[in-house]
Amino acid sequence: MADIFLLAGAPAVGKSTTARALAKQFPKSVHIPVDTIREMVISGVIHPGGNWDQGLIEQLKLARENVTQMVISYNKAGFTVVIDDFWDTNSLLLEYSRLFQEPNMHKVLLFPDQRVADERNLKRSGPGDISEYIAGGIRIVYGHLQTEVPNLERQGWIVVDTTDKNVD
């Protein structure tokens, strides 16, 4: 059976870029960006922010349940699947529990120095409201992960410090 990868991390750590590059390494692969699935909601989408209400939690759960179904279908057809999703400090990505049971599942946390995420955010978004919104997400995720990384490693997560790395 082909591999399944979940790449997670804070905003602006290179999840999508890394996921695409990883998927290209396999002869038959698919990249599933969870943000793209969430953007399929045309009316009523709720974006993560300082206030996580039940509606947001429900939408994230629904997106991840659909991603799980996509992963199972593609993987059953012989595709290597690479998911990219942000680290969710509320659910700890337990919506993927079904996939976590698979022996071919690899959970990868991209964890560069926070300064690198901040720099990438500013370069990508420029100054302004979007950059500030993403910077807030970076602070929240890094605040949580600073103490959580050892637990994640014990749970089988591969933690990759990408501070001085690029996808090449």
Please give the residue ranges for each predicted region:
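Hydrophobic anchor at the beta1->P-loop junction of P-loop NTPases
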Residues: L7
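P-loop (Walker A) phosphate-binding loop of NTP-binding proteins
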Residues: A10
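Glycine-rich phosphate-binding loop used to anchor ATP phosphates in small-molecule kinases
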Residues: E58-E102
